[in-house]
Amino acid sequence: MSYLQRLFSGFSTSAQSVGQFQRMLDWKLLRGSHEFPGPDGGTCVNEAALVAAGYPYRAVYSVQDLPASFSRPIAMLALCLNDTVEDEQRQKLLLPFVTRLAGSADNETVEMERARLILESTIRDILIPALVQEKHADLSHLNRLRNRLSSTAELARALHSLSHSFLPRTLTSACEHAYNAMAQLECRRHTEVVFCAFLAMRELAGWEADGAIYERAAGILKQALEIGKQANEEPESMIVKRMREARRRPVPRRRAGRTLQLIS
């Protein structure tokens, strides 16, 4: 593991650690896809990860545009966060993942395990706390399921029943997204699972100030990355060199369009 990877292996988001990492990579993360890097970087997190890993640069319109070495469910959550959070939070939360995406792809069993973790963590750590905060009478059954460590499927079915209750629209929509994610999990569509789980997160993002939901989402992304294969180990000097060279290339640059949607 390179120094850059070790620096954030514990996912420290202190101002000192983030500042040190930003100075090393010197790369600005932006929303959307981009045909070429600019003098400040200026790409999404997945495009920056291409550069860091030494791949030829390409605009990333969907996770299918990434090399096979990128885990699809991991890349999907990174893409969704990249295109949703505000600039300052994007830099803080996602820049540490630039050196951790290439080489993360694993077999289907592992990828499904990652997708399941992302969905279950979304339900347990983000959706259920929001429902508990609402103090709806129908939550007693859901709390019992959570307390006895019920399966993701049981939790999703309970959420589906809650979506027909008299809850605020944001919560009912989030419950539906979680249930849809469970349906995708049963069909073994790991990328679709993550996309639906993220839609549930996004519905709830306005419930807590200062982007707290997305901070939890980045923590879930880190947990998923700890399952299975890890990023390729390379010298930090090589990674920094690649990032610098990409910024120096005299190529025209314009922002390419990308809409946050599921593309299988």
Annotate each language-model stretch with its function.
Residues S2-S264:
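Short, glycine-biased loop/turn motifs at secondary-structure junctions and
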